[in-house]
Amino acid sequence: MVNLEIILGVVMFTAIVLALVAIILAARARLVSTGDVTIRINGEKEVTAPAGGKLLQTLANSGIFLSSACGGGGTCAQCKCKVTSGGGSMLSTEQSHFTRRDEKEGYRLSCQVSVKQDMDVEVPEEVFGVKAWECTVESNPNVATFIKELTLKLPEGENVDFRAGGYVQLEAPAHTVNYKDFDIEEEYRGDWDKFNLWKFVSKVDETVIRAYSMANYPEEKGIVKFNIRIASPPPGKDDLPPGQMSSYVFSLKPGDKIKVYGPFGEFFAKDTDAEMVFVGGGAGMAPMRSHIFDQLKRLNSKRKISFWYGARSVREAFYTEEYDKLQEENENFEWHLALSDPQPEDNWEGKTGFIHNVLYESYLKDHPAPEDCEFYMCGPPMMNASVIKMLEDLGVEKENILLDDFGG
């Protein structure tokens, strides 16, 4: 009798477990999409892809690359597209980026949209011109204490057809990077030693994608060039992780491979005859160089152009000889370097202070019509904010203040 009760108990327990498993599998089948779905793009092109991923990556796997400066984190809002069917309801992570009208029209962040069923989406036509390359590191020296000039060589016969001020996306695989293994030239090692940056380790368990403005201009073919600043934890914040992509970039050596996607962009020069004033700082040098070289060397522009760049000290200023030469060769161009913290060894006799103050005191204060100029800027957030406020106080309209948020 006891044995029979035990057997019945085991049978009942097994039946309950099997029933629960069946319920879970049924629920999973309803909630987790499997199999392939069809995504119709712009009412014309169709791609078949496995369900379950995010729309941004699903499109990328099919060779359609939407811009995503934040690498799919839902913060930059550059991967927006229209999802007219099959996308479900807008998520709370998307709502701050769109108006109610945008939501009604179907705008979504593709990095937040799950691919669960057949979908209809609309993307900008220029997206179809975006390509992917596996590039080779040609060089990666420091040009300032915390900034590398990364030059990548494209595959033989390939070229990035971009406009000055454009950007591409770099992809880093999962990796572990030790700062102690970085190649930092002797003249720049002082602050690395002072702040003991060698102790940091960047460990990344998944693919990382970030956007960087190009420092080369369209006539410099066969390569892409960047000015990339290391994003190490601030002093006293050792518990914060280092920048994932910048740490990876600082570890790259000649001959290494890295994937590049692009081109993208919206920080383009206006086609007018207005005076152009460029303002930069830090790694914001990249799009400044691209624009200025394009205007003077490719377009042979006769517009009045000036460039105002801020750095801490002489050691942190780069491309100075290139700009000196441009100034000698072009009577319509002049450039000004201002140091906020010149060192005794600099023997600096030039302009000092923060670049927005120098620009105002040295030029805009007595300019007859600053509101008629076009201002292009890229630099650290505090610099950008200070320059924008100054320009607004001078009566410059927003459409004449162009900002690249990538280069700081």
From Swiss-Prot:
Q: Is Transmembrane helix among the key words of this record? A: yes
Domain FAD-binding FR-type, by residue range, is: 130-270
List the signal peptide residues: none
An example Gene Ontology biological process: sodium ion transport
**From the UniProt record, which GO molecular function terms apply?**
2 iron, 2 sulfur cluster binding; electron transfer activity; metal ion binding; oxidoreductase activity, acting on NAD(P)H, quinone or similar compound as acceptor
User: Per the UniProt record, which EC number(s) apply here?
Assistant: 7.2.1.1
Instruction: List cofactor names only.
Output: [2Fe-2S] cluster; FAD
Q: How does it sit in the membrane?
A: Single-pass membrane protein
Compartments it resides in: Cell inner membrane
Q: Protein transport among the record's keywords? A: no
Q: What class of enzyme is it?
A: translocase
Query: Quick one: a GO cellular component term?
Result: plasma membrane
Q: Which reaction does it catalyse?
A: a ubiquinone + n Na(+)(in) + NADH + H(+) = a ubiquinol + n Na(+)(out) + NAD(+)
Binding of [2Fe-2S] cluster occurs at 70, 76, 79, 111
User: What sequence ranges are listed for the domain 2Fe-2S ferredoxin-type?
Assistant: 35-127
Alphabetized PROSITE patterns for the sequence: 2FE2S_FER_2, FAD_FR
SUPFAM superfamilies associated with the record = 2Fe-2S ferredoxin-like, Ferredoxin reductase-like, C-terminal NADP-linked domain, Riboflavin synthase domain-like
Q: How is the cofactor bound?
A: Binds 1 [2Fe-2S] cluster.
CDD domains for this protein: fer2 (cd00207), NADH_quinone_reductase (cd06188)
- Pfam family of this protein, just one? FAD_binding_6
Per the record, the similarity remark reads:
Belongs to the NqrF family.
The record's section on PANTHER family has: NA(+)-TRANSLOCATING NADH-QUINONE REDUCTASE SUBUNIT, NAD(P)H-FLAVIN REDUCTASE
Function text:
NQR complex catalyzes the reduction of ubiquinone-1 to ubiquinol by two successive reactions, coupled with the transport of Na(+) ions from the cytoplasm to the periplasm. The first step is catalyzed by NqrF, which accepts electrons from NADH and reduces ubiquinone-1 to ubisemiquinone by a one-electron transfer pathway.
On assembly, the entry states: Composed of six subunits; NqrA, NqrB, NqrC, NqrD, NqrE and NqrF.
Its recorded name reads Na(+)-translocating NADH-quinone reductase subunit F
